[in-house]
Amino acid sequence: MQLNELKPVAGSRFKRLRKGRGLSSGHGFTSGRGTKGQKAHGKTRLGFEGGQMPLYRQKPKRGFTSMDHKDFALVSLTTLNQFEDGAEVTPEVLVANGVIKNVKSGVKVLATGKLEKKLTVKANKFSASAVKAIEAAGGTTEVI
């Protein structure tokens, strides 16, 4: 057997259907849509249910988007372990080291994982358990 003799398994490769390309193709003229009617002439819009009241209009509106919502960049204690012992960690340092993409509305430190380094952490928000964990490791926290 040579490389040039290799053939795909029978039935594994299909030729793409080219609809609307002449009567002799077998898929010309109406392109497999039947004759006349809404479905033959064009596409129905997204969510259209044939004239029946669509589900998205049957259900009542709920809730709203708060204009006061702040999107904090989240940082875990495990992530803070990459800094040297005694280092000062600020939002600018986190961005510079590629830990977070941007500061957004600020940085919130969460107590995910374990902190093994003594750090001075400056952030906009801390979870209560994160403050305990940082201070237990000998570090300090500062809300900016």
Curated annotation (Swiss-Prot):
GO annotation, cellular component aspect: cytosolic large ribosomal subunit
One GO-annotated biological process of the protein: translation
Ranges of Gly residues composition bias in the record: 23-35
Single GO MF annotation: rRNA binding
Subunit structure: Part of the 50S ribosomal subunit.
Function: Binds to the 23S rRNA.
Cross-referenced PANTHER family: 50S RIBOSOMAL PROTEIN L15, LARGE RIBOSOMAL SUBUNIT PROTEIN UL15M
Listed name of the protein: Large ribosomal subunit protein uL15
Organism: Limosilactobacillus fermentum (strain NBRC 3956 / LMG 18251) (Lactobacillus fermentum)
